[in-house]
Design a protein with these regions (language model features):
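ATP-binding/phosphotransfer module of carbohydrate and carboxylate kinases, centering on a glycine-rich
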Residues: 2-61, 106-114, 157-317
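Generic enzyme active-site microenvironment
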Residues: 12, 96, 117
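Short, glycine/acidic-enriched loop or turn micro-motifs at the edges of active sites
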Residues: 17, 101, 122
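Short beta-strand-loop/turn "lid" adjacent to the catalytic site in phosphate-handling enzymes
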Residues: 38, 55-95, 105-108, 250
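Glycine-rich beta-strand-to-loop/alpha-helix junction loops that act as flexible
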Residues: 66-73, 118-120, 249-260
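Glycine/charged-rich beta-loop-alpha catalytic/anionic-binding loops adjacent to active sites
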Residues: 85-91, 132-140, 272-280
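Short, conserved loop-to-beta-strand elements that form functional interface hotspots
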Residues: 95-98, 285
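Glycine-rich phosphate-binding loop of actin/hexokinase-like ATP-binding domains
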Residues: 110-167
Length: 317
């Protein structure tokens, strides 16, 4: 009888507001992919749904997994780890904030710099030369998440309604957004949108970009303000760990809004460099980077690596 070999593999999940990305480590064992997300703010019986997600992805089961999840606090992390085995998850699972995986993907694990994320939500994190970490923003779509897909579309809707009421400049956005959200008339736009999930609102970002491409000044103003807000997040995070802004800082950025929209990405780079007073070392993160970082952290955590264990169990951003 031939020998049986046990392949040690680790799984990383990056669960944002719009989708879940998963990757394996070591790379090449199995392909990564995208699944429907779960979210603490909107999903009832979160542990059962997360278990279903893990078990649906993890075939065969990994040696361990790290789940990076938006909107999870310390209580939720502890509760999920305790409840997952009762739903059939037999391998060790650690829960971290999605900002932790993004910071690791951006190299803040061991080097100073900034990471800015803009997807359905937004945030910025920074690491100083002394290892101090800070997070700014990412406090939820109702009161934070400036420069995110949701925020940009929300502000476009506000501008469209102001134009309708005669309180703002006329804009193509009024008709374009009314059609995009299947509202019967522009006056009903606000009521229709309020019934939707944040990711459904953020998904209409192409409408804003379409208006911008047609030289709509209101759309341009909304986008410019969003780039400025993201820059402010990055500056605030950096000041928390470095005291002041200066050129030559390493800045990584990612999330669906920045990854897939060149006009926003290029505008952010220009705004950041102007605000920091010179050239920055700008790095675009792929859509899989945070999930890949989570998978690597799972490996180190499971094997008892001190630095990885610190990030998984004690770093909070």
């Amino acid at each position: 009888m031939g020998a049986t070999f046990w392949i040690v593999t680790y799984l990383g999940l990056d669960i944002g507001g719009s989708k879940c990305r998963y990757e394996w480590w070591p790379t090449g064992f199995a392909g990564g992919g995208v699944a429907e997300p779960v979210h603490p703010a909107v999903d009832v019986d979160l542990a059962a749904k997360l278990a279903d997600l893990l078990l649906g992805i993890a075939t065969p089961a990994p040696s361990a997994a790290v789940v990076a999840m938006a909107g999870v606090d310390a209580h939720a992390k502890a509760a999920l780890r305790e409840q997952l085995p009762g739903h059939g998850v037999t391998f060790p699972v650690a829960i971290v904030e999605d900002t932790v995986a993004a910071a690791a993907a951006a190299g803040l694990y061991d080097e100073p710099g900034i990471v800015i994320g803009s997807g359905t939500g937004s945030f910025a994190s920074a690491r100083g030369a002394d290892g101090q970490l800070a997070r700014v923003g990412g406090r939820g779509y109702a009161f934070s998440d400036e420069g995110s897909g949701y925020d940009l579309v929300r502000k476009a809707i506000v501008a469209a309604l102001h134009a309708l009421d005669g309180r703002g400049r006329e804009t193509l956005l009024t008709d374009l957004l009314t059609d995009a959200f299947d509202a019967r008339e522009p006056q009903r736009l606000g009521g229709v949108v309020q019934r939707l999930r944040p990711r459904e609102v953020a998904g209409r970002l192409p409408v804003l970009l379409d208006a911008y491409a047609r030289d709509d000044w209101v759309a341009a103003d909304v986008l410019q303000n969003g780039m400025y807000q993201l820059t402010q997040l990055g500056m605030a995070a950096w000041k928390k760990v470095a005291g002041s802004v200066q050129p030559d800082v390493r800045v990584a950025y990612g999330g669906g809004v920045l990854e897939h929209n060149e006009v926003i990405r290029d505008g952010l780079e220009r705004t950041m460099q102007a605000s920091f007073g010179g050239q920055l070392l700008m790095l675009s993160l792929s859509s899989s980077a945070a999930a890949e970082a989570a998978a690597r952290l799972a490996g180190g955590w499971h094997q008892g690596d001190e630095a990885d264990t610190e990030w998984v169990e004690r770093v909070s951003l």
